[in-house]
Amino acid sequence: MSRAAIKLLLDEHIWQGLAEALTQRGYDVIHLNDTGHRGIDDEPLLVFAAAQGRAVLTYNTRHFVPLIRLWYEANREHAGVILSVQLPSGELLNQAERLLVTLSADELKNTVRWLQEFQADT
């Protein structure tokens, strides 16, 4: 049985080159700035991502943590939220790819994960 791959939506503050780099590696990744929704509030962003079955990768922990709590309490489904501290582009790419290789869409669904869980062991 094959595992469904994660589809990602990168929030507008994430390095835009990440979408291109991951797409070139065969992953389904889009950047918010390429969707016509730049500047969208967080709730509509999550609604948009959920409707497309896309997990959101964001640096915006301040707004997304309480938003996800509200969605959890309301039993609203989403494809997952990945929170991250700001990282250099190479590190961001490595950790994002490690996440995409490690988890399936089903494992990420309705969860919140830290991208830093997927950093290389030192």
Label each region the model flagged:
Residues 1-12, 16, 21-24, 37, ...:
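Acidic, PIN/NYN-like endoribonuclease modules and their adjacent C-terminal/linker elements
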Residues 50, 54-67:
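Acidic, metal-binding active-site segment of PIN/NYN-like and related structure-specific nucleases
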Residues 28-40:
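Conserved BB-loop
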